[in-house]
Amino acid sequence: MIGKLKGTIDEIGEDYVLVDVQGVCYVAYCSARTLSKLGSAGEACVLFIETYVREDQLKLFGFMTALEREWFNLLQSVQGVGAKVALAVLSTLTPGELANAIALQDRAAVSRAPGVGPKVAMRLVTELKNRAPAYAGEAINIALKRELGEGVAAAPVADAVSALTNLGYSRDQAANAVAAAMKTAGEGADSAKLIRLGLKELAR
């Protein structure tokens, strides 16, 4: 099994990169986000690889980080999500944004990915709620998860985060602001109050 490729970029296509490793070229299918972070032909390239072996084909999927690869596999554990849809989700959301969307039960954020309809979005946020990669950093917004806790009604929180992102803030900024707002407002606060308090946090 191939776990990582280190070589030079030979060609970048619409959904793949051709990596030259000592004269042998490998095709690795990637998310649009990963492809956008790669350099140009002739530049060095390092990709974490997930190898798919089927009876009639062998495919390599490439990722900038091991975390992105972990999310790729986790997404496919949900019914209706294959490699194509998993890459579409990772093209639309960063690992951190995806973790926040799941913690917030924010189906709308997940539904922005091509190929993800309402039913699949519901399954993603529901089934993966307690299965996100269990380490901090970009993938997990610790403050937000602490404020939500288990069993907290997430709809007002998701609405507040969505409203703040519509105002131009990043999803991580919005999530942090709403998490701070929940400390002040408490679990029973409606979305309007969370938005007001969140804006105050962002204005500081």
Swiss-Prot record:
A Gene Ontology molecular-function term? four-way junction DNA binding
Q: Which UniProt keywords apply?
A: Cytoplasm, DNA damage, DNA recombination, DNA repair, DNA-binding
Against Gene3D superfamilies, the record matches this protein to: 5' to 3' exonuclease, C-terminal subdomain, DNA helicase RuvA subunit, C-terminal domain, Nucleic acid-binding proteins
GO BP of this protein? DNA recombination; DNA repair
The residue range of the signal peptide is: none
Give positions of region: Domain III. Answer: 152-204
**Segments for region (Domain I):** 1-64
Instruction: Quote the InterPro entries the UniProt record gives.
Output: DNA_helicase_Holl-junc_RuvA_I (IPR013849), NA-bd_OB-fold (IPR012340), RuvA (IPR000085), RuvA_2-like (IPR010994), RuvA_C (IPR011114), RuvA_C_sf (IPR036267)
Q: Where is this region: Flexible linker?
A: 144-151
Region annotation (Domain II) ranges: 65-143
GO cellular component terms, semicolon-separated: cytoplasm; Holliday junction helicase complex; Holliday junction resolvase complex
| Predominant subcellular localization, coarse grouping | cytoplasm
Record's subcellular location: Cytoplasm
Q: Which domain of life is it from?
A: Bacteria
Description of how the protein assembles with itself and partners: Homotetramer. Forms an RuvA(8)-RuvB(12)-Holliday junction (HJ) complex. HJ DNA is sandwiched between 2 RuvA tetramers; dsDNA enters through RuvA and exits via RuvB. An RuvB hexamer assembles on each DNA strand where it exits the tetramer. Each RuvB hexamer is contacted by two RuvA subunits (via domain III) on 2 adjacent RuvB subunits; this complex drives branch migration. In the full resolvosome a probable DNA-RuvA(4)-RuvB(12)-RuvC(2) complex forms which resolves the HJ.
Q: Please give the HAMAP family that the UniProt record associates with this protein.
A: DNA_HJ_migration_RuvA
Q: What is known of its domains?
A: Has three domains with a flexible linker between the domains II and III and assumes an 'L' shape. Domain III is highly mobile and contacts RuvB.
Function statement: The RuvA-RuvB-RuvC complex processes Holliday junction (HJ) DNA during genetic recombination and DNA repair, while the RuvA-RuvB complex plays an important role in the rescue of blocked DNA replication forks via replication fork reversal (RFR). RuvA specifically binds to HJ cruciform DNA, conferring on it an open structure. The RuvB hexamer acts as an ATP-dependent pump, pulling dsDNA into and through the RuvAB complex. HJ branch migration allows RuvC to scan DNA until it finds its consensus sequence, where it cleaves and resolves the cruciform DNA.
UniProt record similarity statement: Belongs to the RuvA family.
* Name of the protein this chain belongs to: Holliday junction branch migration complex subunit RuvA
Record the organism: Rhizobium etli (strain ATCC 51251 / DSM 11541 / JCM 21823 / NBRC 15573 / CFN 42)
What does the record give as the organism's lineage? Bacteria, Pseudomonadati, Pseudomonadota, Alphaproteobacteria, Hyphomicrobiales
